[in-house]
């Protein structure tokens, strides 16, 4: 069931927030995105701390890869 939701969710988010930028969508959903320079191999992570949602992204990646990872972590935030 998650795979069907995963294919529908991006279109719904783009329609609702009038953007395909995952950073803008995260901000609209009150999810804080932070870059981390201490990640070794890890590209990103989603965590909830004291009822606050965070996406952590490896600061050493290209901007294109950061967008991809942010979108991926948004999926974790919304589907799990």
For each predicted feature, which ranges?
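Active-site hotspot residues in diverse enzymes, especially metal/ion-binding acidic/histidine motifs
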Residues: 1-80
């Amino acid at each position: 069931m998650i795979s069907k939701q995963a294919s529908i969710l991006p279109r719904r988010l783009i329609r609702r927030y009038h953007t395909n930028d995952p950073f803008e969508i995260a901000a609209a959903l009150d999810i804080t995105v932070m870059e981390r320079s201490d990640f070794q191999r890890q590209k990103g992570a989603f965590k909830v701390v004291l009822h606050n949602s965070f996406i952590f992204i490896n600061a050493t990646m290209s901007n294109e890869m950061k967008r991809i990872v942010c979108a991926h972590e948004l999926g974790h935030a919304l589907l799990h």
